[in-house]
Amino acid sequence: MKVIKYPAKEEWSEIVERPHLDVSQLNATVQGVLDDVKNHGDEAVKRYEEKFDHAHLASLAVTEAEIEEAEQLVSQELKDALHLAHHNIAAFHQSQKFEGKKVETCAGVTCWQKSVAIEKVGLYIPGGTAPLFSTVLMLATPAKIAGCKEIVLCTPPNKEGKVNPAILMAAKIAGVSKIFKAGGVQAIGAMAYGTKSVPKVYKIFGPGNQFVMAAKQQVSLHDVAIDMPAGPSEVCLIADETANPVFAAADLLSQAEHGFDSQVFFITTSEKVLEDVKKEVEMQLEQLPRKEMAQTSLDNSKFILVKDEEEAIDLCNTYAPEHLIIATADYEQLAEKVVNAGSVFLGNYACESAGDYASGTNHTLPTHGYALAYNGVNLDSYNRKITFQHLTEEGIRNIGDAVVTMAENEQLEAHANAMRLRVKSLK
């Protein structure tokens, strides 16, 4: 980890810069797989499953029998945890329901919005380095609450052609409609274009490696919407002298173990805390099963000493982290100054793990600085707002002349005429 003390503001842009990901070399490979899936459907998906996941599949669909079998394999302890997490996620997202109001913008002109669920959504759940069953809950629960009619889930099988039981259990709890054994680019292509087995969806959600991210971005250009652009996972932790170094180190390592390219950004106003956390990270790292991955991630990370909390929050807002932990005495006041972050964790007891699993907030968040302009997944991610307007004769009298004048000045005569005819009909 790189230690930086009292950096000048002119250095901040370089400090917050993420490792550059050159996906140009991936694009040709990704496009080739997408084209193959588009043209050859299930046959292409099965071929790539055999090539990449070493699974020979007779069928892509997960059966009811497989879901029932998975239910028997999941421990009661994990089932209880999944139900608790689902309850909290549902409660938080239920509170986000939109209530549109009719607004009379002037006499005779009424406007309103209606929230309508996206009918078909696709969820991608990676297999990769860990079975992300928590992401099933995060993506499927709000989709169900929003009222999406079809919730399609794709996830890679193991070599025996089986899907991780916890993923299937989470899918059942959250109300997923259909589950398919497909991973990587081929899964994104199947949901974007549709195959004989996999329905075409209108929007794709979910994390993945560089190939999956490149595939999502490519299909989003023409064929389907996606949740957001994404990069490697990251955390920023702001600490003062009241922070618990043991907790802080654990939080930083929980991010570092996500992947080799994850990033940790630690900002503190206390040199003692910086040194204490640094030592604690080194001690706790030795106990981790994913030590090598966490160590590689820490090599890309920065420990920064700043002069005061105002500078700390300004630097953090410049960084725009996916996760932000504020472990300071006045965390509530600092929280008011956060303008760029995906999800914020306040105080010594609000660890990132809580939000990753069971507090109720969504863990699908903007990374790689995208928090400057994007928010994380929420109920609105699964809805569209359709606007309505109704005009009476009085409304025509009130805005008709203005509409005609504006249309004429934009040299759109047909627009002007559509209103002009209505104005004349009232005279």
Could you say what each language-model-derived stretch is?
Residues 103-169:
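Conserved small-residue-rich beta-alpha loop and adjacent elements
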Residues 318-427:
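C-terminal core of ALDH-fold dehydrogenases
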Residues 2-8, 178-183, 303-308:
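Short acidic-hydrophobic, aromatic-tinged amphipathic segments that line or gate anion-handling sites
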Residues 98-103, 225, 262-267, 287-297, ...:
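Flexible, glycine/charged-enriched surface loops at secondary-structure junctions
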Residues 1-119:
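N-terminal Rossmann-like NAD(P)+-binding subdomain of aldehyde/semialdehyde dehydrogenases
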Residues 175-263:
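Conserved NAD(P)+-binding/catalytic subdomain of aldehyde/semialdehyde dehydrogenases
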